[in-house]
């Protein structure tokens, strides 16, 4: 891929999931990449190993030799010293999605959208196409075990991209195939209303060329509602609703799921994916539908799905003892994601006590969805709620909004053993009392709770009597 081997790209906020993925893609494509972030860690260390120059913190001089500066939607351009310095120096400043849209010009784009399931579905499609010998270029907002990273630079004609709806970023992309994986209220700080969000998905889907295809999950009511507004060809998939591609005979096992795919009247039995939960069956149906549209044989698609080995922070098992003690780390941060993850744990590990540990993400999301979180978490046997991870928001702008709102909502929804613990060290101490046989410690959230999951896993390894 000849993308101009000498340009230097500087990325502000390079440690974020989406930004680190595009940094990795640029590095593998031959660009010189530098970047800055307020904190460093495993993600930035991996980029350094690939050749990136990483700065901790933001300073004017760090953009001096750049040909272009890229920033994420989470960065406020008027407040960031590097972006101001770049604009003053006449260096082009663009958002991440604009850069991604430019890179997509070289390939046929397969873009996976949806309020949930984007990362897993993107990784499933990538694995499937790689196993089929298609050599795709891939960019995922997470770390794939199979890919050993978040990107692949391939020689084939397809580019598989996770399409993020936040800040309307996905409207800058140019999909040949657009997947609508799920749709419900999310990112209201961007859209204001669900109707505006639905209109954005319609606009995204209708960017597909006349020879392309839109692939829609009809199990989501809001997707069913927007289908009449699509003016491109589409196919449907689902479990609960009649669709072109469906799954039946679903068997939920510990760590894997088996099912039959019925596609356009033809049945394909004994499909196995090595991840738990019905929500992952839907993700697999999206991938299978995409492969059919590309003309790949069903047998090769099923074999490819069987090679999918999961994502970091997507029901990632951090510790598993012989006595049934487990620690799981998951990125779930929307009520529907939390509900699906808790359900996967309860359905797949029916003889285990499921202890859900949840860190709310964003004050606004916690305020808007506290009751929904309550219902989502109430099925767990015991629940711990951490305080809110603020991300781009400030506590002062949201008085009275704390993790206690979620804890109270869980109690209201019927949760019997519910604890609000303010402080990660205090939470770590509390979880140590649950190091016992047949216990699944399920840590969920998009913030730094992942570090707690790792710490608890280390404690289990050192103190569990049977590992």
From Swiss-Prot:
The gene is murC. Pfam families: Mur_ligase, Mur_ligase_C, Mur_ligase_M. One of its GO terms (biological process) is cell division. One of its GO terms (cellular component) is cytoplasm. Belongs to the MurCDEF family. InterPro entries: Mur-like_cat_sf, Mur_ligase_C, Mur_ligase_C_dom_sf, Mur_ligase_cen, Mur_ligase_N, MurCDEF_pg_biosynth, UDP-N-AcMur_Ala_ligase_MurC. Pathway: Cell wall biogenesis; peptidoglycan biosynthesis. It is found in: Cytoplasm. ATP binds at residues 114-120. Its EC number is 6.3.2.8. GO terms for molecular function: ATP binding; UDP-N-acetylmuramate-L-alanine ligase activity. It catalyses: UDP-N-acetyl-alpha-D-muramate + L-alanine + ATP = UDP-N-acetyl-alpha-D-muramoyl-L-alanine + ADP + phosphate + H(+). This is UDP-N-acetylmuramate--L-alanine ligase. It comes from the Bacteria. Cell wall formation. Keywords: ATP-binding, Cell cycle, Cell division, Cell shape, Cell wall biogenesis/degradation, Cytoplasm, Ligase, Nucleotide-binding, Peptidoglycan synthesis.
